[in-house]
From Swiss-Prot:
Record's keyword terms, sorted: ATP-binding, Cytoplasm, Nucleotide-binding, RNA-binding, Thiamine biosynthesis, Transferase, tRNA-binding
InterPro entries reported for this sequence: Rossmann-like_a/b/a_fold, ThiI_AANH, ThiI_fer, ThiI_N, THUMP_dom, THUMP_ThiI, tRNA_STrfase, tRNA_sulfurtransferase_ThiI
Enzyme class: transferase
THUMP domain residues: 60-165
Pathway(s) where this gene product acts: Cofactor biosynthesis; thiamine diphosphate biosynthesis
Source organism: Streptococcus pneumoniae serotype 4 (strain ATCC BAA-334 / TIGR4)
One function term, GO molecular function aspect: ATP binding
Name listed for the protein in its UniProt record: Probable tRNA sulfurtransferase
Gene name linked to the record: thiI
Keyword field contains ATP-binding: yes
Keyword Cytoplasm on entry: yes
Compartments in which it is found: Cytoplasm
Its EC number(s): 2.8.1.4
Length: 404
């Protein structure tokens, strides 16, 4: 027998009340986008569940793609069969012969939305259970936590059988919580922060600061590759490259070394916030983890945050490095993150950065610079590229390959 569809059950959508259908429609669109590479697959959704009709597509590949979609609690591969007692009996026997191993227990769980069907749920459980005993005489029934729970659903158009439930990614459908700008450096932490924001339904755009010739084309490609890894969880992502060389040279020339990192981060925050305004984002997201480096003390965060009133989401702020690495390995970004390309935060990093910078001091040093002009020129020079989940190269890839 061949699977005909995948039955998809929702996660936290059950708590969304009057907005439930908006969340469901967004989830349906997200599922359709992720499964668009399987041209045969068709997706529908109603208030209770969604269905991915395989139409001959490879179930295993489709299931792997579904595991990445946020908003799905779990899903089950389903056999569609004729709605008759005899066909149901023979189908149940065929499935059980295929999956049963010595010593396993089972139960039949039937329900029907077609109340004109000749047997009610209790009678159907008994009839199909009897068919299983005919096929496998020594099998044992167990009503609580059996090894095999064979689920039978009688609908108007057909009968559906399933026995396996696969855990989904959970969370909320990407896009239901608004848009956020992810400050993507190229390290381990910021891609994990982006992943966790996606899981809570935030549609992210990646903002990456490049300082050529101090940062290499390889560093830019690394950030782009990390962005591509995140697309499998939320679809296409806009990659925004910000020219940052002029600003870093200005900071280096006009500020004391201890404040280089603080001022660099304040400029990054200003620029990201300006991009957010233009692109209708609601929040800024970054990979700061409390106390991990000098710019991530509470005093530093306060001094850096002072340049904006926009909410800053720090998904990994309370995690230690090993916890973050575990997630990075799970989402397949770790090996890219540890590639030996320096980002613009490390090239001018002072030997002894200030861990408790004062806002008034930062403002005093910035008064030596044309802050607004520097920010405006950086924002005017951004380059935006749409990063897709597919393996084919984007325009930025081609450009970088020519430079390397």
């Amino acid at each position: 027998m061949q699977y005909s569809e995948i039955m998809i059950r929702y996660g936290e959508l059950s708590t969304k009340g009057k907005n439930r259908m908006r969340f469901i429609n967004k989830l349906r669109n997200n599922i359709s986008d992720v499964l668009s590479i399987y041209t045969q697959v068709k997706v529908t959704a109603d208030r209770d569940r969604a269905h991915a009709y395989l139409n001959g597509a490879d179930y295993t590949a489709v299931a792997e793609s579904l595991k990445q979609v946020f908003g799905i609690q779990n899903f089950s591969p389903v056999y569609k069969v004729e709605k008759s007692v005899e066909v149901l009996k023979s189908s149940v026997q065929e499935i059980m012969r295929d999956i049963y191993k010595e010593g396993m227990t089972f139960k039949i769980s039937s329900k029907r939305s077609d109340h004109n069907f000749e047997l009610d749920s209790r009678e159907l459980n008994q009839t199909l259970g009897g068919a299983v005993f005919e096929a496998i005489p020594n099998v044992q029934v167990q009503m609580k936590s059996p090894d095999i729970n064979l689920q039978v659903e009688i609908r108007e158009e057909a009968a559906y059988l399933s026995y396996e439930t696969i855990r989904g990614a959970g969370g909320l459908p990407v896009g239901t919580s608004g848009k956020g700008m992810l400050m993507l450096s190229g390290g381990i932490d910021s891609p994990v922060a982006g992943y966790l924001a996606l899981k809570r339904g935030v549609d992210i755009e990646a903002v990456h600061f490049a300082s050529p010739p101090y940062t290499s084309p390889g560093a830019l490609k690394k950030a782009q590759d990390l962005t591509r890894k995140l697309t499998k969880f939320g679809g296409n992502i806009q990659f925004i490259e910000v020219p940052f060389t002029e600003i870093q040279e200005e900071i280096k020339a006009k500020a004391p070394e201890a404040y280089l990192m603080t001022l660099t981060r304040r400029f990054m925050m200003r620029i990201t916030d300006r991009i957010r305004e233009v692109r209708n984002g609601l929040v800024i997201i970054n990979g700061e983890s409390l106390g991990q480096v000098a710019s991530q003390t509470l005093e530093s965060m306060k001094a850096i945050n002072a340049v904006t009133n926009t909410p800053i989401i720090r998904p990994v702020v309370t995690m230690d490095k090993l916890e973050i690495i575990d997630i990075a390995q799970e989402i397949d970004t770790f090996d890219i993150s540890i590639q030996p390309f320096e980002d613009c935060c490390t090239i001018f990093a002072p030997d002894r950065p200030k861990t408790n910078p004062k806002i008034k001091n930062a403002e005093q040093y910035e008064a030596r610079m044309d802050v607004e002009g520097l920010v405006e020129r950086a924002v005017a020079g951004i380059m935006i590229t749409e990063i897709t989940p597919q393996a084919e190269k984007d325009e930025v890839d081609d450009l970088i390959d020519n430079l390397l």
